[in-house]
Amino acid sequence: KVCKHMGERIQFDVVKDGDNRTILGCPVTFFDIGSTKAKQFGFTMQLKSGKKFTCVGDEPYNEVDYKYVKGSDWLLHEAFCLFGEADKFKPYEKHHSTVKEACQLAEELGVPNLLLYHTEETHLAERKKLYTEEGQQYYHGNLYVPDDLETFEI
């Protein structure tokens, strides 16, 4: 079903650290996140509004990518579980972070908008509430914990 869209709606493009592309009319720079488990990339996109949107990839932020992340208006960061449940979900073994750590990072970097994603799924009904409550203890910007398929304007 999905394969029929390969090469049309779905396109794969091999990138290297620092490569630039234009996507949806916006300049995008890809960066190697420095993963120790597999080659992975994050990206930063200059939105038409002039805002900078950055995704650090599927692992916690790595300081080697500071030059790409600094000055971001939006940060998309994985937050696998609540800090208090790290013993249960073992995010570090999976190369992931907790809500607390993602929020502390965004606060430290002065990012005004933080969107958390890639979470464990045992708290789906109350995930937004629980993650927001924990996150607001460490981050004082605009915190977004979207439900699956939720959309909003950035």
Across the structure, where does each feature detected by a protein language model lie?
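Binuclear metal-dependent hydrolase catalytic cores
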Residues: 1-54, 60, 65, 129-154
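Structural beta-sheet core signal
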Residues: 54-55, 116
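Cap/insert and terminal regions of metallo-dependent hydrolase folds
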Residues: 60-149
